[in-house]
Design a protein with these regions (language model features):
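SAM-dependent nucleic-acid methyltransferase catalytic core
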Residues: 1-15, 24, 71-157
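Conserved S-adenosyl-L-methionine
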Residues: 11-14, 21-84
Length: 157
């Protein structure tokens, strides 16, 4: 098992460790801190977990997953186009609006939460649909909001 500070490379190892401790047949699965859901997704691919209960102390994260799962097309169109830029001003405007509406569980809050995390990810090494640094044809990484197709595909998990 890895240490308390988890790097993205360790998620697969953690999933393997957890998977080896689980029985072959699982009736219920509870994930107390789902975070990026990397561990749950990897486990689900291996075990086909029935009736998963996903939780996290971050209410905005739970709202985000709720809207992606239940209304992926509407969620994709929720952000205001003016806030889709990658400028410092756009990020500051998003943060200000988020502070005004946080903990209300609205689709707008969830969309802004995702956008803020995408913009903040510019400084990290995250990859994948909600880590959002995508590979281009030339080894460059670019930051993009997930496409509507990606959000709909992710919602089918």
């Amino acid at each position: 098992m890895t240490g308390a500070i988890i790097h993205e490379e360790a998620f697969e190892e953690i999933s393997e460790d957890i998977s080896s401790l689980l029985p072959e047949k699982i009736n219920h699965y509870i994930e107390p801190i789902c975070g990026s859901m990397e561990t749950f997704i990897n486990l689900n691919l291996k075990k086909q977990l029935p009736f998963p209960v996903l939780s996290d102390p971050d209410n905005s994260l739970i709202s985000l997953y709720k809207y992606v799962k239940g209304m992926p097309e509407e969620f994709y169109h929720a952000p205001e186009n003016s806030h889709r830029g990658r400028t410092k001003g756009a990020l500051l405007a998003l943060r200000k609006r988020y502070r005004e509406i946080m903990n209300h569980g609205t689709m707008e809050e969830a969309a802004i939460y995702l956008q803020i995390n995408i913009l903040n990810a510019m400084r990290s090494k995250n990859s994948g649909i909600f880590g959002i640094l995508k590979d281009t044809t030339s080894d460059n990484k670019i930051l993009e909001f997930p496409t509507e197709t990606e959000i709909v595909e992710f919602s089918s998990w």
